[in-house]
């Protein structure tokens, strides 16, 4: 039988702390309260205005100030904190160090950790949907002379909560296969 945590801090460190707390399950993807500082530099290497999103201890995305293209910002984060990055205008997903989730590690010799934010290689369909969304108002999508399924695709705007659900599912599948990257809890 698993041992109960003596304190909330200990519960944060215990495996399986996704268990029921206050009557609801804890989200799988959430920041861990490690209290181990990590200096990070967010580098926007994309042509888009970037919206950094920190997943708090309850798994809720918390927006941080935007980063214009070609700029960087020093962030005081912590080991075990989870970050996502989105286009500030369209909410299209962006990559950080070639992946979707960024988890700061400990600094080595006082050097900051770099989080390089870039555009992913979108599929042709995804990119076309982005362009049409930028040119056509949502109320006019169904006036376009296109196949019906594309109306639904256009109306299915990028959504960070859906992405978190998808990433959670991928995390659970990777965990079951024993392939989970270090630092993701």
UniProtKB/Swiss-Prot annotation:
Residues 1-24 have a biased composition (Basic and acidic residues). The keyword Chloroplast does not apply. One of its GO terms (molecular function) is protein serine/threonine kinase binding. It is found in: Cytoplasm; Cell membrane; Endoplasmic reticulum; Nucleus. CDD domains: pVHL (cd05468). Keywords: Cell membrane, Cytoplasm, Endoplasmic reticulum, Membrane, Nucleus, Tumor suppressor, Ubl conjugation pathway. Residues 123-132 are annotated as: Interaction with Elongin BC complex. The keyword Cell membrane applies. One of its GO terms (cellular component) is cilium. Its main location: cytoplasm. Component of the VBC (VHL-Elongin BC-CUL2) complex; this complex acts as a ubiquitin-ligase E3 and directs proteasome-dependent degradation of targeted proteins. Interacts with CUL2; this interaction is dependent on the integrity of the trimeric VBC complex. Interacts (via the beta domain) with HIF1A (via the NTAD domain); this interaction mediates degradation of HIF1A in normoxia and, in hypoxia, prevents ubiquitination and degradation of HIF1A by mediating hypoxia-induced translocation to the nucleus, a process which requires a hypoxia-dependent regulatory signal. This is von Hippel-Lindau disease tumor suppressor. It comes from Rattus norvegicus (Rat). The gene is Vhl.
């Amino acid at each position: 039988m698993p041992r109960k945590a003596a304190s909330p801090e200990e519960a944060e460190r215990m495996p399986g702390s996704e268990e029921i707390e206050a009557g609801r399950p804890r989200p799988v993807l959430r920041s861990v309260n490690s209290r181990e500082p990590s200096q990070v530099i967010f580098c926007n290497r994309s042509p888009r205005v970037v919206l950094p999103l920190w997943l708090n201890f309850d798994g809720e995305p918390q927006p941080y100030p935007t980063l214009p293209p070609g700029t960087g910002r020093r962030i005081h984060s912590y080991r075990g904190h989870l970050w996502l990055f989105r286009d500030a205008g369209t909410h299209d997903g962006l990559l950080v160090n070639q992946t979707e989730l960024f988890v700061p590690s400990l600094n080595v010799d006082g050097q900051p950790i770099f989080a390089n934010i870039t555009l992913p290689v979108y599929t042709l369909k995804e990119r076309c949907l982005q362009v049409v969304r930028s040119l056509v108002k949502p109320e006019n999508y169904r006036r376009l002379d296109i196949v019906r399924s594309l109306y639904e695709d256009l109306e299915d705007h990028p959504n960070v909560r859906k992405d978190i659900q998808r990433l959670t599912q991928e995390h659970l599948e990777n965990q079951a296969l024993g392939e989970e990257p270090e630092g993701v809890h």
